[in-house]
């Protein structure tokens, strides 16, 4: 071995030694073997059940990058090939390194970095032009790409795995139904869908009897397909889709729903978001906001996700969300926390993506596909092992806008769509049918896919 080779080997060995305390802190399940470029090895055995994974680091600098910015460095290393999984899968690796995330918080560098990240996040907001740019970057990738792993209704948000759901399609249909129960859409009502995606929920609400549904989005790709789907379903007049920022809305709506959009708003714009709901919701109206959240105090953004997946995005805590709702004077009539439902959803997406990976490579390059593998697997494990969850907020102007108890959420649809009294009369939630779509100012029961470390994808 030459002197230069010995120097490189020493740097790799030094890097692995520096990495060892951090790995011991976070690996609380399974066994991880880290191989340096010159065959130096580090083995971390948790002594607890879990996957056995071997990874190879192809750069002497990588251990130090992993220590300084773990999330960003790990994601980029996998994308670029400077970290390869020699035994197991990226999903296995992420299951191991997220098994003890509390230990990461105790490392000195994390104690220094976390407060700075929180301060920077407080300033995060998305003005109109920036919001449109950020949305386009993610959602305008290609409808053909999203079709590779989404269900047949194009639902790109957490499914609802109720008893009897045997597939992703079933669980996404259950999600639409569950949100519909909370909205209590009656015949002739007007509905606003903020961040309507590819139109699945809006079209479903039109089918349930809504006279007019306006879906708004900042993604041209989504809007094009949503309009096409409404036309094909025969509901093009009832379900309309516009390119519009929620801050530019006009009119009043009996029902307002927003699924998977609040994560893109940013703390500095929370007031604008809930003010829009307060101003555009009818006096007897009901709104439902469905969002990824963190079961922890407000924190920072994930640097890898912010750079590569959702620029400008931020996962809100329930506390910072509700404090803004309170200032708007809205009643929080129901809160539901979905704990593992998104982990199961992401597991389905990951398996579907892997099974159609060759198709993805026809659309994008290998680095892009590795990025999405990492994204789907990392998100799944953060719902399984981290502090992520989903919350659904039901909001209203009046305390009696919805029934006194939650039985109506689980009653057969024909009994709960519009609650009635003993005489068959509509209760408070029966807003009168008003055509207010005035346009815009600028045109847990089913056996789950539990992760047991057996994935070979």
Q: What spans do the regions from the language model cover?
A:
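Conserved SAM-binding strand-loop segment of SAM-dependent methyltransferases
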Residues: 233-246
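A short glycine-rich, Lys/Arg-flanked "PGG" loop and its adjoining helix->strand segment in the class I
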Residues: 271-283
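A short acidic, Gly/Pro-enriched loop at the edge of an enzyme's catalytic core
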Residues: 247-256
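Conserved SAM-binding loop of SAM-dependent methyltransferases across substrates and taxa
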Residues: 198-209
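Feature captures hydrophobic
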Residues: 1-173, 178
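Conserved class I S-adenosyl-L-methionine
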Residues: 187-195
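Conserved beta-strand signature within the Rossmann-like core of class I S-adenosyl-L-methionine
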Residues: 284-292
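Substrate-binding/catalytic lobe of Class I Rossmann-like enzymes that use SAM or dcSAM, i.e.
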Residues: 292-403, 417-420
